[in-house]
Amino acid sequence: DLLDYGRGILSAPESAKMKTAYIAAPLVGSIYCGSPEEEEENVEEYVSLPVSLFGKGDFYILRAKGDSMVDAGIAEGNLLVIERNCPASEGDIVVALDQEQQNTLKRYVGFDNDEKCFILAYENEARYPEEVIKLKSFEVQGVARHVIKAL
């Protein structure tokens, strides 16, 4: 039986055996998936993330704005689980802070030795074919690890 009502106490014996660890990740606002925009970080709430699904890490959550990352599976309103304090590798989707203190969510392509700049790419071929952002320098504020969305 999944549920037991013995001695007037409702219990679920199988679920009692499961011990799920959670980490609390702050939902700190939104991030534009288009051109860099200035955003403030304000904790709206904390979200419990099961370690068995998300792993351990220093995570925070952002709400996606815009449509420039739809080909990467990120749509307007999706929640993004971002790992902070980790290095970005080529191909990662990053929260990038530019020299003007504006941030955006883009795919990190790498460094262009000819133009001496970092390349961040849009992921919406239909609307932004081959469009990129070129930056002399930027700070990686985190790497996107998971997308949470409603079906």
Labelled PLM ranges:
Residues D1-V70, A75, E90, Q101-N103, ...:
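Short, positionally conserved secondary-structure boundary motifs
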Residues E76-R84:
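Conserved PDZ fold ligand-binding element
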Residues A88-V95:
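Short coil-to-beta transition motif at edge beta-strands of beta-rich domains
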Residues E115-E125:
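Catalytic Cys-His active-site segments of thiol-dependent hydrolases/isopeptidases
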Residues E123-L135:
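Low-complexity, intrinsically disordered Gly/Pro/Thr-rich segments
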